[in-house]
From Swiss-Prot:
Record's note on what induces expression: By elevated osmotic pressure in the growth medium.
Pfam families: BON (PF04972)
Lineage: Bacteria, Pseudomonadati, Pseudomonadota, Gammaproteobacteria, Enterobacterales
Any one GO BP annotation for this protein: hyperosmotic response
NCBIfam families per record: PRK10568.1 (NF007858)
Keywords for the protein's UniProt record, in alphabetical order: Periplasm, Repeat, Signal
PANTHER family, sorted: BON DOMAIN-CONTAINING PROTEIN
GO-annotated cellular components: outer membrane-bounded periplasmic space
Residue intervals passing through the bilayer: none
Signal peptide (from-to): 1-28
Species for this entry: Escherichia coli (strain K12)
Principal place of residence: periplasm
Protein name as annotated: Osmotically-inducible protein Y
Length: 201
């Protein structure tokens, strides 16, 4: 009777140990699977973020290109940003019609889900005053640089600036002086082009 009980006890102990090992293995396996799934989700999330960033960058580039190609839109004053395929246009345009056209162009780009219009219409009078002030400053800077130059006889050179276009007139001693004056004018910030009407003696 005692031996029988002992055998039963050993059998129960063996069953309990086997069950515990199996349970532990199953727990470890489930835990490992959960960890792997979590890591996989993090990787997927990171990949999605990278993918979205790449998509947004591509959309921004396409919108900018589309605006540049449009003849009626001055794209240099328009800023383009894209976040999760939503494009935001900001900056200045010449008219409300131009702003509406810019939004229309952006909406037509592949991948764009919506467009946020934060464009401002520039005041024509304000732009004119700024343009005049800019031309005056450009003329003054060119005159100062010509005066400081040892080659160009600045007292004989007249400088006029209109919308960033500089006109040089007057008389110099040689073609070298004429070329030098033109080079100095072109190097000044804000100058779009130089019309050299200088005459040589």
């Amino acid at each position: 009777m005692t031996m029988t009980r002992l055998k039963i006890s050993k059998t129960l102990l063996a069953v309990m140990l086997t069950s515990a090992v199996a349970t532990g293995s199953a727990y470890a396996e489930n835990n490992a699977q959960t960890t792997n799934e979590s890591a996989g989700q993090k990787v997927d999330s990171s990949m999605n973020k990278v993918g979205n960033f790449m998509d947004d960058s591509a959309i921004t580039a396409k919108v900018k290109a589309a605006l540049v190609d449009h003849d009626n839109i001055k794209s240099t004053d328009i800023s383009v940003k894209t976040d999760q395929k939503v494009v935001t246009l900001s900056g200045f345009v010449e008219s409300q019609a131009q702003a509406e056209e810019a939004v229309k162009v952006a909406k037509g780009v592949e991948g764009v889900t919506s467009v946020s219009d934060k464009l401002h219409v520039r005041d024509a009078k304000e732009g004119s005053v700024k343009g005049y002030a800019g031309d005056t400053a450009t003329t003054s800077e060119i005159k100062a640089k010509l005066l400081a130059d040892d080659i160009v006889p600045s007292r004989h050179v007249k400088v006029e600036t209109t919308d960033g276009v500089v006109q040089l007139s007057g008389t110099v001693d040689s073609q070298a002086q004429s070329d030098r004056a033109e080079s100095i004018a072109k190097a000044v910030d804000g100058v779009k082009s130089v019309k050299n009407d200088l005459k040589t003696k």
